Amino acid sequence: MRAVLTVIGKDNVGIVAGVSNKLAELNINIVDVSQTIMDGYFTMMMMCDISQITKEFDEVKTELTGKGEELQVKIHIQREEIFNAMHKL
């Protein structure tokens, strides 16, 4: 099972490390990642394998939201099938 994770906010030191460490803590594997800085704003999209999580998905979302607040960025995660349904042309 996979999920799409996005991170957006003002660029700052430690965002990638903070997000990656939190994902590892939650047993989430990063499958693919794209990241860029646009005019001082940090943007990152990750494809994640969530098949090994031991918590409910809603709890994972809550913990990632909290990590985003700590890092002063917005972190959003959703299951891949939901993401695809929302972005289908």
UniProtKB/Swiss-Prot annotation:
<comment type="similarity">
    <text>Belongs to the UPF0237 family.</text>
</comment>
<dbReference type="Pfam" id="PF13740">
    <property type="entry name" value="ACT_6"/>
</dbReference>
<protein>
    <recommendedName>
        <fullName>UPF0237 protein lin0537</fullName>
    </recommendedName>
</protein>
<dbReference type="InterPro" id="IPR050990">
    <property type="entry name" value="UPF0237/GcvR_regulator"/>
</dbReference>
<feature type="domain" description="ACT">
    <location>
        <begin position="4"/>
        <end position="78"/>
    </location>
</feature>
<dbReference type="InterPro" id="IPR002912">
    <property type="entry name" value="ACT_dom"/>
</dbReference>
<dbReference type="InterPro" id="IPR045865">
    <property type="entry name" value="ACT-like_dom_sf"/>
</dbReference>
<dbReference type="InterPro" id="IPR022986">
    <property type="entry name" value="UPF0237_ACT"/>
</dbReference>
